[in-house]
Amino acid sequence: MSISINPFVTTNAYGTFSTQSDGYVQGEFLDDPAIRFQLAGGPLATAETLPMWGGVAISETTDNSGTIGLGGAIARASAEANLTGFSVFSQAYAWVQTPQSPVPLAANGQTIPFFRLGSNARIPVACDATLAASLASGLINQQVAWDFTNQVLIAYTTGTALPVKVVDVQIGNSKIVAYDPVTGFATWTNTGSVAVIQI
């Protein structure tokens, strides 16, 4: 006797299954019951020319809009001097996603969830691959810097170091954001390097 088998051909969405599933998603706050109440929010500033996503260095201003409770305006930080925290995807409701731009993006006026410096939140951020390799197995208090143009953690050279601890590094197996300024689309790079920073 024989049993005929005709299994269905199955496919998986790209990046959903792999032999190595140890990785992070840029800008997705690592759950911590003591820190989650530090999550804050504010509208994306009207002067911002780029959409916002998680894992971006931000600058927060005081609320002078007359709308009590919305929080201060959030913009991209341009230097250490105006860096106040990092944006996250956690509780980023109603951010825009399309098939061409699968990364959730926020436009002007939409609420940006973020953690302030000093909150002790652990946030995976995009990291230069060479830096990630040098940080692996190192002390958590190594000095690092931030590339405010490309929104990526880079090696410290001179000036003020980023006031963070690097508590983990994942090389080549994490999802990081790739933004195309020409099309305005943001896609996931599934082979990115990430550093988990405690801010």
Regions found by a protein language model. Give the residues of each.
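Surface-exposed, low-hydrophobicity beta-strand/loop segments enriched in small/polar/acidic residues
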Residues: M1-I199
